[in-house]
Amino acid sequence: MQMADLEKKLENSVLPPLLKRELSEKILREEISEEYLVDEIISETTRAYERTLVEPGEAVGVVAAQSIGEPGTQMTMRTFHYAGVAELNVTLGLPRMIEIVDARKEPSTPTMTIYLNDEFKGNREKAATVAKNIESTNVESVSEDISVDLVNECITIILNNQQLESRGLTVPDVIDAIKSKMKLKIEDHENVLNLKIKTPSLKALRKRLPKVRAIHLKGVQNIKRVIIRKEVDEYILYSEGSNIKEVFDIEGVDTTKTTTNNIVEIQDVLGIEAARNAIIYEMDATLGNQGLTVDKRHLMMVADLMCTDGVVKPIGRHGIGGEKASVLARAAFEETVKHLYSASMRGYVDELGGVVENIIVGKPISMGTGCIDICIDKSYEEGKEL
């Protein structure tokens, strides 16, 4: 049986396109040629698919909420080490779950999992070179001491030659970086730099000291540390800090697999669809790390709701909860007086189209049997044919 024959058989099937393709490939791979067997497989697959569909009128939102919320009560409040990487602390458990649904712009412990291209992933030295190019280096990280010299009225930097060499930098590189950021006169005494300003004073020198320490020399901004680990037959980099846009520009990085736990950053760089997938993955991984299993469709429901407007929105009064069309639904969530006061000032009308507002006014909700309207023919007589 050919692919074209299978496509014709599945043409009017209710199965989604992806499932149709996978089923066709499986039948061809197993070399099933008998037509009655193929028909039976398609029929059984269709029945199994239809059993997985939600019944009309099912309260999927409530089911999703309780399915995620109940395991959430069993989650720990502590921060654990990231899977297998003892040197990096990453927020897990309930705090991480709250971060995800709140759509925080910056996670409390941003981290990246950086995969390498075929040329780099099997060689530790090449992986270390990529790690050096990614790890952010500032003046403070290559210095033994940075202090204010009151006698000579300058800022003195004592450079660490070993650190400079390990990071592939030289003294002129440091001088050029400082000059590009600040207007200073620099005196070079081998590994000691004296930074002088036009009108020196203790206050002026102390004001410049933190800025000098933070001057960026090399690597990707915000990536404080990079750790190399061998997993199975390849080296993978784990970073403390996240900057996916700049990391993608580093030679040797596999941009198709590299990821970050910063969902808003994924949205900005890769788009809303990637952010949606990241929300599902992060929630599933956070629950799985605690030994909890939740059907992915509940997580997909939350992710779809957060991403439905094209940007990642938090589930709360500053996001989805505070933007509901119904005044009563908004008032029922949080900030009740504020919403009712605002609605009365503007003369809003609530159409009572949702669940919450109908419960508030005591009307049947449009779910389950309530989603059906029954019509009665008043002219109907018993025994009369319809």
Swiss-Prot record:
GO molecular function annotations of the record: DNA binding; DNA-directed RNA polymerase activity
Catalytic activity: RNA(n) + a ribonucleoside 5'-triphosphate = RNA(n+1) + diphosphate
Domain of life: Archaea
BP-aspect Gene Ontology terms: DNA-templated transcription
Subunit structure: Part of the RNA polymerase complex.
HAMAP family hit by this protein: RNApol_arch_Rpo1C (MF_00411)
UniProt-listed NCBIfam families: RNA_pol_rpoA2
Protein name stated in the entry: DNA-directed RNA polymerase subunit Rpo1C
Encoding gene per record: rpo1C
